[in-house]
Amino acid sequence: MNYNPNKNEIEFVNNALEKFNNMHVGPDNHLLLNIVEYDENQNVIAGILGGTYWGWLHIDILWVDENFRSKKIGSRILIAAENEAKKRGCHSVHVDTMSWQAPDFYKKHGYELISELDNIPNGYKKFHFI
């Protein structure tokens, strides 16, 4: 057993799973969906990073600079990502967030909590929304 596989071995495992998945459900047609927002000096002040596949948008990261929070920037880029996902044929969104991050933000936007993990890290929670 190797706890530090090289790049080729990692790629082999990824490709093997992709081939297996494709045999069962067809290609995922994964496309990145990344959006950033700038201030007046073209500095990045917010971003959403994710991708679309199998009819879903997965949000990996949604971040807004602390100096620009409570100005609807997060809402604006979330809605922009949702709209782009719909253009790509997506029917749903899923996202994870931590208890100190943005669970209330996603609830405010109509997301439904579907699971919660305790003590990740110790004393905190991880939430999964759709």
Where in this protein do the model-derived segments appear?
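Conserved catalytic-core motifs of GNAT/GCN5-like acyltransferases
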Residues: 94-96, 112-128
